Swiss-Prot record:
The keyword Membrane applies. It comes from Arabidopsis thaliana (Mouse-ear cress). The lineage of its organism: Eukaryota, Viridiplantae, Streptophyta, Embryophyta, Tracheophyta. Residues 214-223 have a biased composition (Acidic residues). Residues 396-407 have a biased composition (Pro residues). This is Formin-like protein 9. Residues 1-24 form the signal peptide. One of its GO terms (molecular function) is actin binding. PROSITE patterns: FH2. Belongs to the formin-like family. Class-I subfamily. It is found in: Membrane. It is a single-pass membrane protein.
Length: 782
């Protein structure tokens, strides 16, 4: 790589443009130079390639820094002393200007240098990526190593770690670089002091191929024997060099049966040398695959918490297990010599490694939780911290006793704050006024209170069950009417007997007419002798039924109350129709407009079968004039007619007269909203109402009605009949005159009234035509 950068540097030196001083005069070249050209130029240091980390390491290595750009060397210019004013330089008579032709070689040289540098960087990056890809594929191919090599490799690591003295024990990530420790010629900057997570767990040895599918079931069945700590870290591989024989964690002996050992590696503020991880081992790859396939979600979550939250938990790694459940204990702590499957063992380790913020809490609980030892099923413990002579013989410890039960603390754990809050218990409660009163201070008579202030209400059980006769909707309407009614039931019955419609009013009479019961309901109401057996609505109707022909009286009084208003409405409608007929016949401007339309139609029909000699046309043609468009596509035949009228009558006068048609024919528009059939039905209904009153009087006389109330009712009804008969005669005369006027207008504009099915249709045609004509006049005026 150094040769590659040296070649680039030499090429840049050869491509550098000549100095502008070479073109200067001889006088300028005679100046004293402060730089020796013969001195060798400082060669650029070759970039130190970062150590290669295999893919099997737990944390991915940071991306390698880009190669430093080689410093661009330019031609060296002569330097001058600081006191340049003291120099006596020869001056020429004419100033020397640099030729513009010298700029082109300089610029081209700069561009060539930039192009060469970019091309070199691109080729170097591409070569580096291809090399990394080849190394990754080579590392992945090493995963297929044999099982025997793995056994020997792990056993060798265990023996090397067991023979080391406590002083020679190294922890993971604590070894320094060889270059720094041996005092190399140059200083290598150390990496960021971050804690790297350990490699994954080694696999449990099985000769079967379906290990990954069966190991989950066995772990669930024997969950008490094997427990993976949430804060577990994974043992590192052995060092590649003999000088680094002490690994960061003691690798246990791997056997077909499951066994494990626990080691600790406290966080180190420095990174370990990268050479510890340069030699990939197949067991690492297999352990990583096994850990990713069978690891529980809780283990991943606690490991993530330990690595990212910065709590500094000790890393506990389970490396191997033995059939006898042997354990390997480090000299740093005896708490982590065993992994208990119970939650209190996990909580004990969590308290021991807790940050300072939990010291108050852990100080109270640690004394209780530390009394728990390893499970009673553990047989022996091996201490690595002892001398090498003692490590050869491992004494078997007696089984520990059962841990004592947890004793709850006498006081609850409360985090004391600096600011003391005042509780309600500190202040004595105030004695209220009501607490000072005595129960025997005053005596009240319960009987007197009930007698004076409590209404006499019978027991709900003693109340009779009310029978519901009417329809629920009808009963609700009657109840609403009684609430809005200002009269009592007796007053209503008296007004019906007297025939006084002014007392009741038209609205009340209309409501009573709608509440008329059926014959079956009327029979049931009359069957109840006592009103307490029925509801208020039924009781009201029962009182009304005592009046003879009560609902016929209600209909008669309602007709009397509405008679005068109906007659007035009929008179107005008939008068409007008659005035509309007169307006159509006597309107001069409307006649001129119809004549202009007739002439225009005859002119357009000259060369047709009709020969243009029509004398009249139906008013339906007025609505079709606006649909006949001219060649311009905008003006219609009605526009042409209005324009011709403006020429003959004068533009201003004709336009104002046409616009005034809406005012002259205002009653025509009102008549278009009136239905002649409705007018005739109203007249017939009034006549039928008079006949119903006469029939009621006859029924009352035949039933033997007598008394002052009957006489009053008969007298009022007889007087009304006389007045109503006179009004009916007048209305009928007005109706006949209106009908004759309609026939005359229809014959005048349509020719034959008998062929017209709709009597009032002529008014609707004129109303629609006037609206279209008004729009045309506005367009013509604009």
């Amino acid at each position: 790589m150094q040769n590659f950068w040296f070649a680039i540097f030499f090429f840049l030196l050869t491509c550098a443009p000549p100095s502008p001083l070479s073109y200067a005069s001889t006088v300028t070249l005679s100046r004293r130079l402060l730089y020796d050209y013969e001195s060798p130029l400082p060669l650029p240091l070759s970039p130190i390639s970062p150590p290669f980390f295999p893919l099997e390491s737990s944390p991915p290595s940071p991306p390698p820094p880009l190669p430093p750009t080689p410093p661009t060397t330019f031609a060296v210019f002569p330097t001058f002393p600081a006191n340049i004013s003291a120099l006596v330089l020869p001056r020429s008579s004419k100033p020397h200007h640099t030729s513009p032709t010298l700029l082109l070689p300089a610029l081209s040289a700069v561009l060539v240098i930039a192009t060469v540098i970019g091309l070199a960087l691109f080729l170097y990056g591409r070569h580096r990526g291809q090399t990394r890809h080849l190394k990754n594929s080579h590392c992945s191919s090493s995963n297929t190593s044999s099982y025997g090599d793995e056994q020997s490799h792990i056993t060798t690591n265990f023996n090397m770690a067991a023979t080391t003295s406590p002083s020679e024990v190294f922890y993971l990530n604590t070894e320094e670089s060889d270059h720094i420790r041996t005092g190399g010629t140059f200083f290598l900057k150390q990496d960021s002091p971050e804690i790297r997570p350990l490699p994954p767990l080694p696999p449990r040895s099985f000769h079967h191929n379906n290990y990954e599918t069966e190991v989950n079931e066995e772990d669930e069945e024997e969950e008490e024997d094997v427990f993976f700590s949430p804060m577990a870290s994974l043992p590192g591989s052995a060092n590649s060099s003999p000088s680094h024989s002490c690994s960061s964690s003691c690798s246990g002996w791997v056997s077909p049966a499951r066994s494990f050992s626990i080691t600790m590696s406290p966080p180190n503020p420095r990174y370990s040398d990268a050479t510890n991880l340069q030699s990939p081992s197949p067991e690492r790859l297999r352990v990583r695959k096994n850990y990713n396939g069978n690891g529980s979600s809780s283990l991943r979550m606690f490991s993530f918490w330990n690595q990212n939250m910065g709590f500094g938990f000790p890393r506990i790694s389970s490396a191997s297990t033995s059939p006898d459940r042997g354990f390997i204990r480090t000299p740093l702590s005896s708490l982590y010599s065993s992994v208990s499957t119970s939650p209190d063992g996990l909580f004990r380790k969590f308290l021991d490694s807790s940050p300072p913020i939990w010291n108050d809490f852990s100080r109270n609980v640690k004394s209780v939780l530390l009394s728990h030892t390893a499970s009673s099923r553990r047989d022996f413990v091996i201490n690595i911290g002892e001398s090498s002579s003692q490590q050869s013989k491992v004494p078997a410890l007696p089984p520990p006793t059962r841990p004592p039960p947890l004793v709850p603390p006498s006081q609850p754990f409360v985090v004391q704050n600096d600011v003391k809050k005042q509780s309600f218990s500190d202040q004595p409660p105030k004695q209220l006024h009501w607490e000072r009163l005595r129960s025997s201070s005053s005596k009240l008579s319960k009987e007197m209170v009930e007698t004076m202030f409590i209404a006499n209400s019978s027991n709900p059980r003693d109340l009779p069950i009310q029978n519901q006769v009417l329809d629920p909707r009808k009963a609700q309407n009657i109840a609403t009417l009684l609430q809005l009614l200002n009269l009592s039931t007796k007053d209503v019955c008296q007004a019906l007997l007297d025939g006084d419609c002014d007392v009741l009013g038209a609205e009340l009479l209309e409501c009573l007419s709608r509440l008329a019961p059926s014959k079956e309901e009327e029979r049931k109401l009359k069957s109840f002798s006592d009103g307490s057996e029925i509801g208020p609505a039924e009781r009201f109707l029962k009182e009304l039924l005592h009046v003879p022909f009560v609902f016929k009286r209600v209909d008669a009084l309602l007709f009397v109350a509405n008679f005068h208003s109906e007659i007035k409405r009929l008179r107005k409608s008939f008068s409007v129709v008659q005035v509309a007929c007169e307006e159509l016949r006597n309107s001069r401007m409307f006649s001129i407009l119809l004549e202009a339309i007739l002439k225009t139609g005859n002119m357009m029909s000259v060369r047709t079968n009709r020969c243009g000699d029509a004398d009249a046309f139906k008013l339906d043609t007025l609505l079709k004039l606006v649909d006949v468009k001219g060649l311009d596509g905008r003006s219609s035949l009605l526009h042409f007619v209005v324009q011709e009228m403006m020429k003959s009558e004068g533009s201003v006068r004709a336009l104002e007269g046409i616009r005034n048609l809406n005012t002259e024919l205002s009653n025509v528009k009102k008549s278009a909203d009136i239905e002649y059939g409705v007018l005739r039905s109203n007249v017939s209904r009034i006549c039928q109402g008079l006949k119903n009153i006469e029939a009621l009087l006859l029924l009352s006389e035949e039933s033997g009605s007598y008394g002052d109330q009957w006489l009053k009712f008969k007298e009022r009804m007889t007087r009304f009949l006389k007045t109503a008969a006179e009004e009916i005669v007048k209305i009928k005369i007005r109706e006949s005159s209106t009908l004759s006027a309609l026939e005359e207008v229809t014959e005048q504009f349509h020719g034959d009234a008998s062929k017209e099915g709709h009597t009032m249709r002529i008014f609707m045609i004129v109303r629609d035509f006037l609206s279209v004509l008004d729009q045309v006049c506005k367009e013509m005026g604009d």
